[in-house]
Amino acid sequence: MNTDDANIVDDKACQLESWVKSTRTSLERWAIPGCNFGGELEWSVGGNNQTEDTVGKTQFWLGQVKKRWVPVGENTVGISTTLGTMVTRPAMGSQPEDKDYYLNVPVTVPLGQDRFVHLNAGWVNHQTLGTNRPTWGVGGELPLTARVIAIAETYGEAAMGTRYQLGLRMWLVPQRVQIDTTYGNRIGQPEHERWFTVGLRLLSPAFLP
């Protein structure tokens, strides 16, 4: 999901989030590892390799830190803050790198029986464009079985349109190995902007010193 939750990876543990996103004209391959070394902080560094029919290959690199202020509980709303940066390296060497800085505040509201609503409010600074824009997201999780979860979200950035995703998550190994698949599009746009994703998430037990 693009809409983040307020949780972080377990203390002294790590995770790897990876996925492939396919559209009619592009293919993205993402991998973002993250670890919690303590202090209720999750550090992540990763990126993608993207191929587009019209511009060739583009790379994205990101680094971020997520601070959890209030853990999500059975009757407790969780709150976190994320600060990060993303660097875009265009396929055409004549174009300069683009760098964005972003802030996001994820809030997770528990509804009981492992049902959750996630609310995001944020801001992004596009260095090359010289603009600042608000960002937002609303997402939800609904368990269908002990291992299968339905997910849905809508999110956007000011002046960039509203997008949505629908999909499923499945635990292959509870709390350790999860796969997911989604379908998404931009609201009011033709089919050529739609996308499909397939993802894999790996979570480790605590092992860091």
How would you describe each model-predicted region?
Residues 1-209:
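Transmembrane beta-barrel domains of Gram-negative outer membranes and organellar outer membranes
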